[in-house]
């Protein structure tokens, strides 16, 4: 039991140290993408700089052009939207909601008092 525990703890500790060493090595090199090339961008450029340079080269075809087109769309309010909305007078069976059980109507099992007879 103790031998298994010690071997597990040794494995766990060594794995953590290895992971820590790997993350510190990548953090010390700077940008993770510094060694990669994206469509001819210089190594050391960030992905954002590379995309911006590519967009400028392709006559603004890309993310910025899509955002610009979305922002240039005109949205209009219809007359129906501007009309006064119906309101209730605050009672349980208000003006905008039909009466549930008018006076004199009997409540049956079938209706369950949800609608008038």
UniProtKB/Swiss-Prot annotation:
Subcellular location: Secreted
UniProt-listed GO biological process terms: calcium-mediated signaling; cell-cell signaling; regulation of growth
A GO CC annotation given for this chain: apoplast
Signal peptide stretch: 1-27
Glycosylation positions in this chain: 31
Pfam families, alphabetized: RALF
Disulfides per UniProt: 88-96, 107-113
Pro-peptide region(s): 28-71
Chief location: secreted
GO MF annotation terms: hormone activity
Transmembrane segments: none
Keywords: Disulfide bond, Glycoprotein, Hormone, Secreted, Signal
Family to which the UniProt record says this protein belongs: Belongs to the plant rapid alkalinization factor (RALF) family.
Function (record text): Cell signaling peptide that may regulate plant stress, growth, and development. Mediates a rapid alkalinization of extracellular space by mediating a transient increase in the cytoplasmic Ca(2+) concentration leading to a calcium-dependent signaling events through a cell surface receptor and a concomitant activation of some intracellular mitogen-activated protein kinases.
Protein name, per record: Protein RALF-like 27
Organism (species): Arabidopsis thaliana
Taxonomy of the source species: Eukaryota, Viridiplantae, Streptophyta, Embryophyta, Tracheophyta
């Amino acid at each position: 039991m103790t031998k298994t525990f010690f071997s597990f703890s040794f494995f766990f500790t060594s794995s953590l140290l290895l992971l820590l060493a790997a993350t510190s090595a990548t953090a010390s090199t700077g940008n993770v993408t510094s060694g990669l090339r994206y469509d001819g961008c210089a190594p050391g450029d960030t992905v954002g700089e590379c995309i911006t340079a590519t967009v400028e080269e392709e006559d603004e075809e890309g993310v910025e052009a899509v955002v610009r087109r979305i922002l240039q769309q005109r949205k209009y309010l219809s007359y129906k939207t501007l009309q006064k909305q119906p309101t209730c007078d605050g009672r349980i069976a208000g003006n905008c909601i039909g009466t549930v059980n008018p006076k004199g109507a009997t409540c049956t099992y079938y209706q369950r008092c949800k609608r008038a007879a």
